[in-house]
């Protein structure tokens, strides 16, 4: 079976030029399975659901628990009807074949006997004796009347007490209970959920049903649970658009490919490296190398933050040495420069003895400063994003109702404020990851770095204008005594800033995902233009009359303006 990455890559190869924010299909009903519509937000859904689905793309659908159960039952009924088997047997088949109805049909009609044997569905059920004679339990070997004995399709008799203990143990052991077989070691007959419903306790039945529900998502390559803590929604993903960012109704956005938080415009490998770098010890070692020196005796790193050059290592070492030359302090004094200088160090430095050490320290310092620059801004945008999410919640819970009363405007006409906050939250996320992008952008590609920093700076400026408008300018209307004649102008301004900022950030994302290809194309055009001009000048020098003049003039094509 192909891996999930292979499936997604295949979709990517088949797709044309990616439209990253338009989604893949017009509706989730366009999927191959032809499953019923389970949309993003119902018409009577509350505002929070509407807000959470604001950026929902058409290449995925959010599934609630009731949606998942409905799909499970639909699949079970389809298999049961087509194969003329019970729903219990159909659920066992689907669970074995990872809830793929098509594969169940293919395997069953190709070799029904083999499938029955593999899955544990017997063609003919063994009927226990109908008389009143007692039966012996195959586990405890006690004799019981027929009403105290239970069995599955194989007919092996076990008392209800042993069955209950067997089922309880397997359920508490984990999801393996979904593949339960007859307790007889030589028998492979499957145990369905009907036996669980009959003999398990209420808590165990609830746990079994939870495993059963989760198996539908976890066994399906195009479905995943939302990774947000405490979220019970699942995502049904349709590959093909090249955009792997999905947004759950809980408001958490994540990457379908790596299940980390949504991270466009950087790819999954860059995110993995960045997260690892943020949590690894490499930057700690860089800091130690840049800001400390090892004790000459015990090699423990020591930081000098103030005072003279006389250093004393911590116990039990207690070695006294010079910070500059690392020599024993007993060899130092007024003749070597006193407490704040070291002649020995200056002489050795001039002779080049510390060149390699200083070079390493300088490299570590530069590396640390560069990382700190990008990390601080990455973290700052994350903090700003969290603050914007809190402000959005406050706008939903308090400000909209208050503003509606003050301005005599229905809340339905104030959604432009929520749209602005949503756009700010999204832009903060994008801006945050541009700093990871910039950190890994090769330093020798100067043109790309300049273009990137320009785009990033413009994005920050535009976002700040939008943020200030919705955060500061709105206050005057919240504290106003009554309707303000300037409110419509504010609405127009905020809606316009939201639209402009959205378009700019979409273009920024596309530019970065394309590797800033515009820089290369502009460089190529400039090179081509320069070459054409040079050729034109040569022709003009050698040629005669208007012909050579036109040759020179024709080299000025529209590319020259790029």
Swiss-Prot record:
Pathway: Protein modification; protein ubiquitination. Pfam families: Ariadne (PF19422), IBR (PF01485), IBR_1 (PF22191), UBA_ARI1 (PF21235). Its cofactor is Zn(2+). Residues 133-346 are annotated as: TRIAD supradomain. Binds 4 Zn(2+) ions per subunit. Members of the RBR family are atypical E3 ligases. They interact with the E2 conjugating enzyme UBE2L3 and function like HECT-type E3 enzymes: they bind E2s via the first RING-type zinc finger, but require an obligate trans-thiolation step during the ubiquitin transfer, requiring a conserved active site Cys residue in the second RING-type zinc finger. The active site probably forms a thioester intermediate with ubiquitin taken from the active-site cysteine of the E2 before ultimately transferring it to a Lys residue on the substrate. Belongs to the RBR family. Ariadne subfamily. This is Probable E3 ubiquitin-protein ligase ARI7. It comes from Arabidopsis thaliana.
